[in-house]
Amino acid sequence: MTVIVSSVHADIYMYIDDNGVMHFTNAPTSNQHEYKVYLKERTSVSTRFHATDKYDKLISNASEEFNLDSRLLKAMIKAESDFDPRAISRKGAMGLMQIMPENFKMLNLENPFDPWQNIRAGAQYFKKLYKRFNGKLALSLAAYNAGPTAVDRYKNIPPYQETEEYVRRVLRYYRTFKQL
C-alpha cells in the first residue's frame, strides 16, 4: 500500500460580510473585516487510495437518509477531494464533497470542513439534482460539477473538459467500489 504525505502550511480565515455571506482566505488582505481563524494549520496530509473506509459510516448514514448508493457517494468523494476533508478547490468549493459557498445556506451547512456536515450536504444536493434530472446519473453528476443551469442549457453533459472528465472519473470509481 502506498502512502503519499504532503505538507500544508496555512490557516484558513473567515469573515461574514454585511449580507451574511461567508468569505474564506488563507491570507487576510484587509483590516476592514473581522477575520477569525476558521481552520488551524495542519502539518501533514496522508492520502491512500485503499484506505477509504475512514468515512464509511458517515457515507452510509447519508446514503440511507437520501436513498443513494453509498458506493456512488464514496466515488464522488474520491473524485472531488480524494478523501481530504480540508480540501479547497481553486474555485472555492470546500470539504470532502466540495460544496460551493453559495450552496451552504440552502443545505444548512455551517462548517464545510466537518466531514458529517459536508457529506450530508453533498448527498442532499446530489439527490436534489438526481430528482431534477429524472434519475439520469451522468446528467446529475455533470450538474453537481458544472451546475444545473449548464446541464439545462446544453440538455446534456456540458462540453466542458473538466465536467466530462469528472463524470468519467466518478463512474470509474463507482465501478471500482462496486467490485470491492
Model-derived segments and spans:
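Short loop/turn microsegments at loop-to-beta-strand junctions
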Residues: 10-12, 94-95
